């Protein structure tokens, strides 16, 4: 359905052959939007960092400023006159070259299917690769919310789409209601009744709304560990931190 919906809007859909051939594939496809799971962006982050670590002198300093000022831009922080000049140089000498490596027309990377580490999201945005987090399930056809280019809040999955209504239950679970919700599982009434109650789909995800109306996923309902002291411990946060290490691919 996701594939067909894009074609119906007049878009062309390309699939990368492999991670190793990604850049060559993108130079041919020249995508405007690319979607992938967080692990892809973790691998991309590691590879770019490795490439940056080999630079010395002026190039190294330029890259450091690109990341530093890029993060300030992302967080809407005010730049000094000197930083504006440096940022202009970074845009021409660093970000533009990186964008061209990915086809030159990329408007956004969209991450879904799991939590994207904030450090990775900030880094990719800072070097000229707009990276958004989205949220959805197969049962919601599939997108519930997504960040908006120019208004990116990395730690959130953006505001809910107008096609659905989202609320947080008393125990913190994200509930979704709208025309995009499935009718039910095929010939599985019991399972359907367990997940859809009074028109609300119980996602199994724990979340909250930020002050600006963005949805923030904090954990999976079934993946929270309660220790002997009664503390709630998030497995996913620990797993994401472990995956930042080059030698750890999955945790």
Model-derived segments and spans:
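Hydrophobic alpha-helical segments in the ANL/AMP-binding
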Residues: 1-9, 120-122, 143-147
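C-terminal boundary motif of the adenylate-forming
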Residues: 206, 245-251
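Conserved AMP-binding/adenylation subdomain of ANL enzymes
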Residues: 1-95, 105
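Active-site loops of AMP-binding adenylate-forming
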Residues: 116, 125-130, 137-155, 188-191
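Conserved ATP-binding/catalytic segment of the ANL
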Residues: 160-227
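Active-site glycine-centered loops adjacent to acidic/histidine catalytic or metal-binding residues
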Residues: 113, 136, 158, 205
């Amino acid at each position: 359905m996701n594939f067909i919906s894009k074609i119906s809007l007049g878009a062309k859909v390309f699939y990368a052959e492999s991670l190793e051939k990604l850049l060559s594939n993108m130079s041919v496809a020249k995508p405007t939007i690319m979607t992938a799971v967080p692990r892809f962006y973790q691998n991309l982050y590691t590879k770019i960092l490795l490439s940056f670590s080999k630079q010395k002198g002026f190039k190294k300093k330029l890259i450091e400023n690109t990341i530093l000022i890029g993060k300030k831009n992302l967080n809407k922080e005010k730049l000094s006159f000197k930083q504006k000049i440096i940022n202009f140089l970074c845009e021409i000498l660093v970000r533009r070259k990186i964008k061209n490596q990915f086809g030159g027309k990329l408007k956004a990377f969209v991450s879904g299917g799991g939590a994207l580490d904030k450090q990775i999201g900030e880094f990719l945005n800072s070097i000229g690769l707009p990276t958004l987090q989205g949220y959805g399930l197969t049962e919601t056809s599939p997108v519930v919310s997504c960040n908006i280019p120019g208004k990116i809040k990395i730690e959130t999955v953006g505001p809910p789409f107008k096609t659905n209504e989202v609320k947080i239950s008393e125990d913190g679970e994200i509930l979704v209601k709208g025309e995009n919700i499935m009718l039910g599982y095929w010939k599985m009434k019991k399972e359907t009744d367990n997940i859809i109650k009074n028109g609300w789909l119980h996602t199994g995800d724990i979340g909250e709304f930020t002050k600006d109306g963005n949805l923030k996923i904090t954990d999976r309902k079934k993946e929270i560990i309660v220790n002997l002291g009664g503390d709630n411990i998030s497995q996913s946060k620990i797993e994401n931190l472990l995956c930042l290490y080059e030698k750890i691919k999955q945790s």
